[in-house]
Amino acid sequence: RNYRKLGGILKNVLDTVQRLYAMGFWLEIVTLVIPGFNDSDEELRDIAQFLARISPDIPWHVTAFHQDYKMTDPDNTSIATLLRAAEIGKSEGLNFVYAGNLPSRVGNWENTYCPGCSAVLVERHGYRIDSCRIRDGRCPDCGRAIPGIWTRPDLPADPPSN
């Protein structure tokens, strides 16, 4: 609703998300939650429902706004608001919802869980991966396929520098 105020055309963004998914591209959607701008339950629910209609397996990252650079009038996004956004995403049927950019302050919303058995698959702290249990794109506990782009476990996490 407020996207137009920023000079964007929301329909173009939504159409592009649908088109890219239909073409087989891997998508992860990030929503910067800005107090008083796009943090209402209705707006967050609309985003989550839109994504879930395309695929419940599209990861949705809700991130906190910080008063930086030129946009300094709204308050920073509170932890409670970010957690509410994540809960809305989960309640609307999204399998992979993350609350980001507030490391150690969003509980388990940094981690990836199996939608089949709820096992912890990827443990994170901020942008650091502490452990990844996904093997061959599957949950090691129940065998459910976990959508994403996964590397083989025998490859180094960081490529050697030249």
PLM features: residue spans?
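Short cysteine/histidine-rich metal-coordination sites, predominantly Zn2+-binding motifs
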Residues: 128-140, 154-162
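Conserved AdoMet/S-adenosylmethionine-binding subsite of the radical SAM
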Residues: 1-80
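Short, non-ligating residues that shape and space the ligands of small metal-coordination modules
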Residues: 123-124, 148-149
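Residues immediately within or flanking Cys/His clusters that coordinate Zn2+
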Residues: 109-111, 136
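Acidic carboxylate-rich catalytic motifs and surrounding loops in phosphoryl-/glycosyl-chemistry enzymes
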Residues: 99-105
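Cys/His-rich metal-chelating microdomains
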Residues: 120, 145
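Short alpha-helix
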Residues: 79-89
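Short cysteine-rich clusters marking metal-coordination/redox-active sites
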Residues: 114-117, 139-142
